[in-house]
Structure formats: C-alpha cells, structure tokens
Amino acid sequence: MQPSGHRLRDVEHHPLLAENDNYDSSSSSSSEADVADRVWFIRDGCGMICAVMTWLLVAYADFVVTFVMLLPSKDFWYSVVNGVIFNCLAVLALSSHLRTMLTDPGAVPKGNATKEYMESLQLKPGEVIYKCPKCCCIKPERAHHCSICKRCIRKMDHHCPWVNNCVGEKNQRFFVLFTMYIALSSVHALILCGFQFISCVRGQWTECSDFSPPITVILLIFLCLEGLLFFTFTAVMFGTQIHSICNDETEIERLKSEKPTWERRLRWEGMKSVFGGPPSLLWMNPFVGFRFRRLPTRPRKGGPEFSV
C-alpha cells in the first residue's frame, strides 16, 4: 500500500470501493447499523451556533416583513399575497436547511480497513487502495476526510458551518435548495423594503407602520443589510454548486486542480444524479424522500407488541 501521508489521485482504485462498502467485519457492520438508526448530527460548537443564528436571522426577517410592513398595510391583497410568498420561501429554506444538517452527507463506514476485508477484495498486482489513518477506513474514489465531522465523506464538496455539516454526495441537493430559497427570500424582502420606504416617504411615517418612525427605520435598515448580505452569499454559493454539479467536480477537487481519474458525467446527467431523476417540480421540493422512522413501543406484560 502507498504511504498514508498524502492522497494520490493517479493511483488505481479497486472498483469495489466505489460501491457501498459491503464488508464482512461484524464489528464494523454493527457500527454502521447503529449510525443508520440514529439521526445524523455533528456536535460542533461553532456549527451549532451558526445554525441557530441562521434560524434567528430568518425569524427576524419574517417578523419585520409580517409585522412591520404587511400587517399595517391598507391593501389587503398586497399583504396576503406577499405574506404567503415570503413565508412559503422561508419554510422551504428552513426545511432545506434541516435536511442538509440532519442528512448523512455520504460518510464512509469507520473501521472497514480490516485485514479480512482487504483480503476479500482479491486485489490484482499493481492495484492500490488508500487507507485513511484518522478513521481507519478505506477511501472510495473522490472521498475526503473532514476534520470537523471526523469522517471520510464521499464526494465531499466542503464543510459549511452555517448548516453544521459537510456538503457531500447525499445532501448536496438540499444545500442547493437552501441557498436558492434564501436568495429568493432575500430578494423578496429587499423589494418589500423598497416599497415600504417609498410608501413611508410619500405618506406619514406614523401611518405606514405600527411602530414609531425611528424603530421602523432601524428595523428596515437592518433587514436591508441582512438581505444584501444573505443574497450575495447564497447567490454565489448557488452558482458555484450548480457549476460544480454540471462539471462533475467538487470544490475540493477544483481547488486542488486534480486531474480527474473518473469518467465525468454530462451536465444534465450530473443534475439528474444529484436531484434524482429527470427535471420536474420535485427538484424544488426539500420534503421528497422524507420518511418518519418507525419506533418500537415497549410491550405490556402479557400483551402483543406494537409499532408506531
């Protein structure tokens, strides 16, 4: 085997390692099953603070839009239509954020680099596999080790503290939706702020809001700054993610300028692979694939067993 000090892209990887890492180690199998039964969550202090801040900032924007701009408006349909649109975008954004944060990004099972498993691969002379010394696993093609998640992640793009998770093979779709819905809601909030300022300047400041004029101005200015910051950040991230998907190249691979040893997908094939299936409105739905886990209930003495 090659020394584990650095990763070589020009080595030949065993084809079995690109699949689901099925191996015969009983201890590793039980460990993988335990991970599958638990909700994926990274216990990182900085990431959890950033995730909570994301929700608080969205809640602040929703408060200003609803209670400062829309409810005091005399135009009923203007308030209803814009309120429904903004709150739908906010719900979709936060749902996408949760799915990104709580979805396994494609972690490689720990401890599968056992002697028995390596012997079962039946490697040919000259074939090379790569073992991660940190989590004691055999790295599949295009997997990278995350020092925060402490796992090797398939097709790892980057670790994002705002979602407290890595963006990888299994949750990249939700991250793309999160950036898109945050960008759209930011644009909508900025447009509403513009209309609100025009309405207040043309009329009376005391009539355009239930709050005092100084408080109204401060709330609107903070919302404008938040909207500009969020839109700039998420629009750039959305563009880079779509570019990476279409080029079948993660951000880590692009920064390292690594020569691809894999067959790159066509642009639409990459999009269909990430979003699951041909183009449809389901691409925009963060709830697709969401399932409640069946939890066994504790049986009563002498009674039958039930599941909910």
Swiss-Prot record:
Changing D44N: In a colorectal cancer sample; somatic mutation. Residues 1-50, 97-173, 239-308 are cytoplasmic. It is a multi-pass membrane protein. PROSITE patterns: DHHC. GO terms for cellular component: endoplasmic reticulum; Golgi apparatus; Golgi membrane; nucleoplasm. It comes from the Eukaryota. The active site is at C160. The keyword Transmembrane helix applies. Residues 72-75, 195-217 are lumenal. Pfam families: DHHC. The keyword ATP-binding does not apply. Its EC number is 2.3.1.225, 2.3.1.-. It is found in: Golgi apparatus membrane. Keywords: Acyltransferase, Golgi apparatus, Lipoprotein, Membrane, Palmitate, Transferase, Transmembrane, Transmembrane helix. Homooligomers. Heterooligomers with ZDHHC3. The DHHC domain is required for palmitoyltransferase activity. Golgi-localized palmitoyltransferase that catalyzes the addition of palmitate onto various protein substrates and therefore functions in several unrelated biological processes. Has no stringent fatty acid selectivity and in addition to palmitate can also transfer onto target proteins myristate from tetradecanoyl-CoA and stearate from octadecanoyl-CoA. Palmitoylates sex steroid hormone receptors, including ESR1, PGR and AR, thereby regulating their targeting to the plasma membrane and their function in rapid intracellular signaling upon binding of sex hormones. This is Palmitoyltransferase ZDHHC7. The gene is ZDHHC7.
